[in-house]
């Protein structure tokens, strides 16, 4: 259920600029979103997996907090992340 190194590196370079910039809020939100999609697929196959469901809810909360922080700090970067990840309609 974890991201492979190649997928993680691709997400980091896409949203962070280079492979060393992992602390950027956009990178963290993108990684959270990627893990959320993977866990959602896992939970569709295994609906009784309550531990993974709890992990999914925790990751959703972390992404929500990171997006709220990004919205308060820089609204332009927030809107760009939403557009790139197709999070809001």
Curated annotation (Swiss-Prot):
The keyword Cell membrane does not apply. One of its GO terms (biological process) is translation. InterPro entries: Ribosomal_uS15 (IPR000589), Ribosomal_uS15_bac-type (IPR005290), uS15_NS1_RNA-bd_sf (IPR009068). One of the primary rRNA binding proteins, it binds directly to 16S rRNA where it helps nucleate assembly of the platform of the 30S subunit by binding and bridging several RNA helices of the 16S rRNA. Forms an intersubunit bridge (bridge B4) with the 23S rRNA of the 50S subunit in the ribosome. Belongs to the universal ribosomal protein uS15 family. PANTHER family: RIBOSOMAL PROTEIN S15, BACTERIAL AND ORGANELLAR, SMALL RIBOSOMAL SUBUNIT PROTEIN US15M. Part of the 30S ribosomal subunit. Forms a bridge to the 50S subunit in the 70S ribosome, contacting the 23S rRNA. This is Small ribosomal subunit protein uS15. It comes from Chlorobium luteolum (strain DSM 273 / BCRC 81028 / 2530).
């Amino acid at each position: 259920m974890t991201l492979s190194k190649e997928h993680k590196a691709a997400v980091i370079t896409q949203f962070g600029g280079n492979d060393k910039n992992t602390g950027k809020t956009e990178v963290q939100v993108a990684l959270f979103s990627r893990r959320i999609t993977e866990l959602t697929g896992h939970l569709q196959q295994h609906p009784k997996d309550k531990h993974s469901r709890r992990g999914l809810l925790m990751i959703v909360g972390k992404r929500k907090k990171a997006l709220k922080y990004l919205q308060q700090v820089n609204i332009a970067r927030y809107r760009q992340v939403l557009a790139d990840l197709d999070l809001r309609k």
